[in-house]
C-alpha cells in the first residue's frame, strides 16, 4: 500500500502474514515501510495459546531509521527486539508484560541543533521491562462503535544497558456512535485522552528519544 503521513512524508508499505504458521497456530508477520523520512522493518510471531493456556506470547524484531533533520536537526536509528506476554484477568480486564532490548543511535547531528541534542549524539542501549493493564468495555476490539477503554502502564529501564528511568503512562478512549446522536450508523465519534510521567534515576538524565511527544509519535 501507499499513502502520506505528516511525520514521515510519502510512504510505501508491504507486508506478509501467515495466521497458522506450519500448522502450529502461530501468527507470523513481516512488514516493510519506506518513506521520505522513515524506513522500518518489523518481524513478529505470536502464539495465541502459549503452552495451551489462556496466555498470548510473542516476539518482535525491528529496525527503524528516522530522518528528523528538518524538525530537530538529527537522524535516529533503532534496532532491537521485544518479548511479550498477555492474559485475560476477566471478561473486561487484561494485563500484558514485555521486555525490550534496543540499540539507539542519534547521529548526523546538525551544528545548529540545540546543545541538549548535540550532547546526546551517539549510541545508547535500552533494556526495559513494561506492564500495561487494560479495562475494556467496548462493543468490539477490532471495530469499536460504542463503549470505552482505559489503559494504565509503567516502564522500568535499567535492567542492564545504560539508560535508567521509570515511566508511568495512561490513556483512554470513549466511543459514541453517530446513530445515537444523528441517526447515522456510518460514523463514530471518539474522545481520547492520554498522559505520562517520567523520572530518571542512577544519575541519568532524560534523553530526547525517551520523552513523551504529541503527534505522530505520541508515546
Where are these regions (language model features)?
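Gram-negative/organellar outer-membrane beta-barrel architecture
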Residues: 1-151
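C-terminal outer-membrane beta-barrel translocator/porin domains of Gram-negative envelope proteins
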Residues: 1-10, 103-219
